[in-house]
């Protein structure tokens, strides 16, 4: 399944991107993959398409102490994380 989520940022997009790169091995172990991410022009909000086995898996992963700490240190307001919508079908042109 895929979801579209958003989270508020206090340090801009670059630290958030680096955090996701650093956490990629942990995400892969948990079966979670970031498909796409983008920010608003002010870089205080990121929008992310995430692929996972189920929504509970993502919640459990995101609430792990080390993951929440890494997200917070990168400027993500963990409490602001919001699932905008599950994604049914999608199209990504190559």
Where are these regions (language model features)?
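Short S/T/G/P-rich N-terminal loop/turn motif that feeds into the first structured element of a domain
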Residues: 1-68, 73-94
